[in-house]
Amino acid sequence: MPRRRRRRRAAPGGQVPPELRLAYGARALTLGRAVFSLLPSPRHCESPCPACRGRVASGCLACRRWEHLLRDGDPVAYRRLITRAVCAIAADDLSAPPPPRYTPGNSGHSQARLVREMMKSIVADQSHGTKNVLCNGLHEGGQSICISDLVSSSSWSILLHRIGDLLMCYLLRCTSIFLPVKKNDYFQVSGVPLNVVLRNPIFASTVARKHQPQTTKAKCHTCYLWKSANMAENLSICHDSSNSGVNSSFSSTCKIVTQQSCETCGSIRRAESKDPSEGCNCPKFPSDGRSGECCNCYTHNTRKRKRLYSWQRRSKKKQVCSVDESSAEWSKLNGSNFNMSNGPSENLAGKMNDQAQSVELTVDNTSLARSNDDSSSEIKVINATILSSEKSPCSVFDIRGSQGLSCHYSLSEVQYQSTCPQVGPSSYLHLNSCSICFNCIISNASKHLSLDSLISRNGIFYNRRTTYSVFHCKHILSKRKRPDALSLVKHIFGINSCCASLLKYNCHESTIRKSNCLCCWLPKSIKNLIRNSKRCQYKKLFLKHCSVKCKVAPDVTKNDGKAHYPPGGKAAYYDRSFSRLEAYSTHQQVASFVWAVLKRIVPKPLLGNSFGKRSLRTNIWKFIKLRRFETFQLSDCIGDLKVSHYSWLSNIEFSNCFCSAIIGKQTGSSTSAEEQKQKNILHCWISWLFSDIVIPVVRTYFYVTERESKRYDVFYYPKSVWRDLTSNAIASLNKKNFRILRGEPRKAVRHLNCSSRVRFLPKAKDMRPLVDLRAKSKDANLNKCHLIMKKLRDEKPEMFGSSVFDYNNVHQNLSQFISSKRSQLMKKLKVYIVVADVSKAFDCVSHDMVLKMIDDAFKCDEYTVRKCSKVICNRSKNSLYRFDSNASIGNGNSIYDLSIQLSSGGGIFVDQGTICRILKEQFHHLLYEQIKCNILKIGQKYYLQQVGIAQGSKLSPNLCSLYYGHLENSVLSKFLHDSKLNAGEAFSEPEYLLMRFIDDFIFISFSLEHAQKFLNRMRRGFVFYNCYMNDSKYGFNFCAGNSEPSSNRLYRGDDGVSFMPWSGLLINCETLEIQADYTRYLDITIISTITVKMHSSTKYIHSKLCHYMRPKCHPIFYDSNINSPGTIRVNIYQAFLLCAMKFHCYIRSVSDANVSKLELLQVIKRTFRYMHSLIVRRMQDVELHYNVRPVLKLRRKETIWLGLTAYIRVLQQKQSRYKDMLTLLTAELGRYCHLGHECDTLRYAVDDSHSSMFWKFKF
C-alpha cells in the first residue's frame, strides 16, 4: 500500500521551534502571521476597507493580507524572513500598549534611521526597568552594531514599505523577534531577552511549575506516636492537679495542655475563633501567662482566614458525623472497668461521664480549628482520664505508614477515631514511658528507596591514591571512635533524625519471641560486621583472587630495585615494560575478590541463604562488568533477591507489638503493607552494601579506566601494576618533554593553583597523557582564544595549509578534485595514493616556532568577543535549559559580522550586550601561558612541559594544524612545485590533492614518480620542525622500491578491490570512491562500543538506533558526483549491517525488556525512514553552507529494502533468539521483493564479498 503524502499548508508559514513554543505558547507565531494578528479582523467583501477605503487599486495589508505581504518576484531572503522568522506578541495582561491602528504608507524614513530612532527611544525608557535586546549593542557614542545591522537589511526595508512605520515601530518595541541563523538556530533581535523571560515569575508559574516535582510535607508517623504519648501524659497530670476544680476550668486546662502538645508535634495552629466580645461564657484562666483573657477565645491568627474548598468542606462534614458516633462509643467505654486511673481521677471521670462531653477537632491545610455548637457556647471535652488510659494517643492523628519517611510533611486530617486497639496496661505503660519498640522504628522510620535510584559509580574511576585503609577517613567504618551498632543501624537504614533518639535496645518481650526480634538480633550482627571490617586481611584476599604474576613478562621484573636493560638499551626496556598493559584483572577475578571480602566481613545471615548468596554474587558481577557510561539502579542490585532469602527479615512479626497495633488501626495495614515494609528494609540494606562496601573495596585496590583501543570496556588494573605503568610513562615524558619543579617554583605554582591534572589512558602499546584543562579560570580564557583562532581559520585558511577539520571539508576538496580530473578517471588511469601519520604529533611541537607563527598570523591590534546565551529544549523532558556561549564579533572597531558557535541540535541565541575586548598583547600572553607555562600535576609532583603542547585543550588541534600548515607552506609546497617543474608538467591545474587532518596526511596523484618522491620526502622527516613519521602507519598502493617501509596499511577485501584507510574513510585506489572504514571493529567486540540502559522503553531503543545511524549519514558517502550507484547502496547496506549488530547486542543486554516483536519491527522500520530523511536533509545543508552541489539518486523504497535485507542477514546468525522476528522481517521484505529482481545495483550491494569484513566481527 503506497504511503500517503502529507498535506501541505494552505497559507505560507514555517514551524515555530520548540524552545519558543514552550516559552511563549500560542503567542509565538511566524512574522507574517504575527503582523496579521495586530490588524483588525477582515471585513466582508461588500464593505470597503477602513484603512485604504478603496482609494488604492491594489489594496492594502488590511484587505489583501498575504497577497500584499508576499508578491511574485520577492527576494528569497525576504520570503525567508516572513515565513521563518518568529515573533512573540506581548501578552494582554502585561503592560504593553495596544497595537496601533494600521494606516497604509509611511513617512519616507529609511529602515536604518527608524531603527536608530527607536533604539534612542527605548534607551530613554530603560530607566523604568524595560529591557530590549535591540539596545544591547548600543555604544556610548550612539553607534549601533550587530543587531541593528540585522534589522536594517534590505529585507526589512521591503517589510517597512508594506506594513508602514507604526506597525514596524510596534514590532521592534513591544514584540520579541527571532531570526533564523541556520536550519535549527535562531537569534533574538528584539524584545525582552529570552533568558530573562525564563526567570520571570509568570513563566515559572505557567511552565516550570508543570515540570518541577511538587514537594509535599507530611509528618513522621513515629514522631507523632511518641509526641502524642507525651501529650497524653500531660493530660493525665492535668487530671490529678484539677480534681477540685469546676468542669469549665478543667476544660480550659486540658485545652491549654493540648495546644502546647500540638505545637511541639509540628506546625499545627488553632483556627480563627469568634471575637471574645461576642458573648463568651468561659471563665478566665491565667495559667498560660495571659491574665484577664480567656484561653479558649485567644487565638494566634498567623494569616488571613480563607474559605475551604468544597471537597474540604464535605470532608469536614463527614468528620463531624464520625465524631458524633465515636462520642457514643466512648460513653459506653466509660462505664466499663477498663480504667487505669485511681483515686480522685476516677471520681472526676464519673462526673464527666454524666455530662456527656466530647471534642470535635478538624484540621485544614493551615490551622487546627475547634468547632463550637451554634445552639450553646458550651465546649464539649472528652474525659481526659479515658483518653490517657483507654484511647491511644496516636489515634488522635491520621498516621499513614506508607509515607512515613520524612519529617517535613503536613497533616491533611487530624481526627478522633471511633475505635481503639485493645491492649494491656503494661504495653501502654511502655509506650507512655516515651519509648517505641525497635521493630516499628526500623520498619516505619527507615528511608524509602525507589527502585529507580542510582548507585553512583563515579567513585571507582581514576583513583590513583594508595591508602592503608579500605574505607576513607569519612566512612562510618573508619572513624577514630569506633561506631556502635545503633549508629551503624541508623546509617544503613536511614533512620530519620527526629526518630534517631527513639531507637534503643527495646522490644516487647511479652508479645514477640526473641528469635524473631530485630532488637535482639540485628545489633549483635552489626557489631560483628564492625569487628570483622577491622580484622579482615584484605591484602591476602586480593593476592589470592587477583594475582597478576602470570601476565607480567619476565624481562620487566625488578631485581633488587635495579633495572637490568636488554641489549636494545633503555628504549627497548621501556617498550617491553608495556607488556604490563595486559596485566589487568578480569571481571571474574574482581567479582571473586569482592565476594570473598563480603563473606569475611558480613555475617552469614545478612548475606541470605544459598539462593540469596547466588543472586547477590551475580548482581555484583553485573556491577563489575558494566561499561564506562552505563548506570546501575537499585533494581539491578536487587535482581532476583527476595525477602524469603533472608530469614531474619521474613520472620519479623510486626503485628504483635502495641505500636504496630496502633499504626495498623490508623492506616488499615494489611499483609501487603507488611511485605512492603520488609522489602524497603531489604532495599536499604542492599543499597548500603553496594555503596559503602563494594565500591570502596574496588576503589582501594584497583585503578579503573577504559582503554583507547577498546572503546567503552572497563579495565581493572591493580594499584601496583598501574603504579609501574605510570612511573615508566612519567620517566619517558620526563626524559623528553617535561621537567620536574622543585623549590621556589613549586611553592609558587601551589600558591597560584594554576596547574592542570593529568591522567593516563592506556593505548595498544603505550600510555597517552590526557590533560584536564576544564577549570573555570582557564576555560573562559581558552574559549576566547579558541574563537579568535577559529575566526582566523575562516578568514585565512591558507595559513593552515591543506588542513581539513571535518568531513564537510573533505567532501568539498575531494569533489572539486574529482570534477577537475573526471577525464582521467573515465580513462581508468592509475591513481597513486600515499598516507602518512606524524609520530607523537602534539609532543614534538616547538614552543618558540609556534609562538613565532602566532605573531605572524595575528596582526590586528584588538579583538572583540561578544557574550551570548543559548537556550535549548530537552524534548524528552519538555523543559528548557540555558547556558552561556561566546560569539566572535570582529576585529577592532569594524564589527559588522556575527560568527556564532552554531550547533546541529539547534537553539535560541540571545545577545547579552557584553563585549570583551582583547588586545593583541593580551591574546599573545594568554597563548604564551598556555604553551610555555603549561604546568601539569601528576600525583603529588609538578612538571613543566618544555616541548610539545598538551592534549585535551580546545586550542591544541588548531595550534597543531597551524604548526603543520606552516611546514607545508614552507617545505612541502616548494618541494611539490619543484618536482612538478622538473617533470615538465603543466602548472595550470592541480595534478595532485593533499589533505591533512591534524597530523594524518593523504596525497593523491596520477603520477607514480610524484607519489614516490612524496613518500621518500615524508620518510626523511623534517628536522627543523622536529617532525618525523610513524613507520608503522604508512600506506601506499604502488611499489616503493628497495626502501619500501616494513608495514603498509592497504586493505583488500574478498572482492579484490583495494582501499586506503584514512581518518575513518576507505578510499578506492582505482576510482577514488568513498566508503566508511569499519576495520577498527575487527579487533574489538561490537558490544564494547555501545552503552546500554538496563530498563529501556521502545522509544529509547528507537533513539539509540537512530543515534547509531547518524554518523554514517554524511553526504560524502551518497553523493553521485563521487560514488557510483552500486557504491552508494553498499554504504547504506553496510551502515544497516552494523546497526543490526548493535541492535542484537542491545536487546541481548536488556534481557528483561518487555517489548513485543511487533513493536521492535515498527522501531526498525522507523529507523529506515529516519536514515533516508536525514540523508536528504544533510544533502540540502551541504549545498546551502558549502560550495558543493551533491546529487542524491536514491529512493526511499531502496533504503527500506536494503535495511530489511541487512537485518535479516545479521539476525539469521542468531536464529534461535530471533525466530519470530525473522518471520516478521521476511514478510515485510516480501512487499518490496520486486526491487531485488529489477535493480542490479541492489543485488551488487548485498553481495557478501563486498562486505567481507563484517562477517569477521564479534557480536
UniProtKB/Swiss-Prot annotation:
Chief localization: nucleus
Catalytic function, reaction form: DNA(n) + a 2'-deoxyribonucleoside 5'-triphosphate = DNA(n+1) + diphosphate
Domain Reverse transcriptase: 742-1067
Domain of life of the native organism: Eukaryota
Gene Ontology molecular functions: metal ion binding; telomerase activity; telomerase RNA binding; telomeric DNA binding
Tissue expression: Expressed in shoot apices and immature embryos.
Cellular localisation: Nucleus; Chromosome, Telomere
Binding residues for Mg(2+): 837, 999-1000
SUPFAM superfamilies named among the record's database cross-references: DNA/RNA polymerases
Cited Pfam families: Telomerase_RBD (PF12009), TERT_C (PF21399)
Annotated Gene Ontology cellular component terms: chromosome, telomeric region; telomerase catalytic core complex
Any single biological process term in GO: telomere maintenance via telomerase
EC id: 2.7.7.49
Keywords: Chromosome, DNA-binding, Magnesium, Metal-binding, Nucleotidyltransferase, Nucleus, RNA-directed DNA polymerase, Telomere, Transferase
Function: Telomerase is a ribonucleoprotein enzyme essential for the replication of chromosome termini in most eukaryotes. It elongates telomeres. It is a reverse transcriptase that adds simple sequence repeats to chromosome ends by copying a template sequence within the RNA component of the enzyme.
Family to which the UniProt record says this protein belongs: Belongs to the reverse transcriptase family. Telomerase subfamily.
Subunit structure of this chain's protein: Component of the telomerase ribonucleoprotein complex.
Protein name as annotated: Telomerase reverse transcriptase
Organism in which the protein naturally occurs: Oryza sativa subsp. japonica
